[in-house]
Amino acid sequence: MRDRFLRACRRQPVDRTPIWLMRQAGRYMPEYRAVRERYGFLQMVKTPEIAAEVTLQPIAAFGVDAAIIFADILPPLEGLGLRLTYEKGEGPVIHNPIRHPHDVATLHPCDPRETVAYTLDAVRLVKRELNGLPLIGFSGAPFTLASYAIEGGGSKEYRLTKRFMYEQPTAWHDLMERLGTLVAEYLIAQVEAGADAVQIFDSWAGTLAPADYRAYVLRHTQNVVATVRARLGAAAPPIIYFGTDMAGLAGELRQLGTDVLGVDWRIDLDVAWAQYGYEHAVQGNLDPMTLFAPPELIASRAREILQRAGGRPGHIFNLGHGILTETPVEHVRYLVEFVQSYPLPTTTPALQEVMQ
């Protein structure tokens, strides 16, 4: 059953819980490091053959239930006219950040089919090698992309972002609409290239108060989801939304219209699922640091998550964030094998609800 992941996204019964891991292709893998020694990060992202090779590495190494295209959320911003580099020890840097309404007005219209064509080519290459295993495309969410564009890189407090949001609300919503259009078109293009599902990463939205999320973010993310569904119709894929520190936004996340909501490790899975509503599938939620623990503790924590899911159709096992750089490879393999061998309950009230 190679479609376990897609079936779980749609809350359909599966024979076991599917598992894939955010940042499953990364520096913790010696195969990845061997490639990284020869190429810069952006060169890897922008060379379809290399991106495809790296995407496939964890499939060969661990047999996870889905691949996620090797890419990054920020390169699509280059099509708008933002200058992006990745600096050693500093991470992504945008050299002409958005600080004034004029900066928003002068952003270039762009078509990601042209400006991020390398990722779409990588999707096509990977799709040919997966033999029916699902491929996940992704994008940053409008808010997270706006935060990077305004801050000029990462941030801990997002002071510039929030000040722009509060002090320039008209320009803020203009920026979010432009980014929403970019995100929707990028996701649609990935599906057209062969992606079977898409994930929207809203890495920094957990910094917002619920009132601010409702006022400045919610409708723009809703529009992305609605646009993807409307444009693709019956071909629309499962849509996943993920952010960290989102437990206080459960009421807002229920309104996004996505199929799957990601859960980080700061809330128990069953509590989050009840808050999000059982009309959603959920994805998560092992603390990435747990993979540094002894195998018996990894098993204990994974078992608890699976028990909290209770066999209800619609659980995709994942971490609550990306795999960390120095994670032991053998612990990743142990986790995948443990989850894939864990027996689902043969009868549960949740399963009976779906099958009736």
Curated annotation (Swiss-Prot):
Q: Which InterPro entries match?
A: UROD/MetE-like_sf, Uroporphyrinogen_deCO2ase_HemE, Uroporphyrinogen_deCOase
Kindly state which keywords UniProt assigns to this record, in alphabetical order: Cytoplasm, Decarboxylase, Lyase, Porphyrin biosynthesis
What GO biological process term is on the record, naming one? protoporphyrinogen IX biosynthetic process
Q: Name one GO cellular component term.
A: cytosol
Predominant location of this chain? cytoplasm
Q: Which EC number applies? A: 4.1.1.37
Self-association or partners: how does it assemble? Homodimer.
- Which GO terms of the molecular function aspect are on file? uroporphyrinogen decarboxylase activity
The text of the family note is: Belongs to the uroporphyrinogen decarboxylase family.
Q: What is this protein called?
A: Uroporphyrinogen decarboxylase
A matching Pfam family:
URO-D
Q: Organism classification, top ranks?
A: Bacteria, Bacillati, Chloroflexota, Chloroflexia, Chloroflexales
In which pathway is this protein known to take part?
Answer: Porphyrin-containing compound metabolism; protoporphyrin-IX biosynthesis; coproporphyrinogen-III from 5-aminolevulinate: step 4/4
Q: Where in the cell is it found?
A: Cytoplasm
Gene3D superfamilies xrefs: 3.20.20.210
- Marked site: Transition state stabilizer: D72
Protein task? Catalyzes the decarboxylation of four acetate groups of uroporphyrinogen-III to yield coproporphyrinogen-III.
Q: Where does substrate bind?
A: R23, Q24, A25, G26, R27, D72, Y148, S203, H321
Catalyses: uroporphyrinogen III + 4 H(+) = coproporphyrinogen III + 4 CO2
The source organism is: Chloroflexus aggregans (strain MD-66 / DSM 9485)
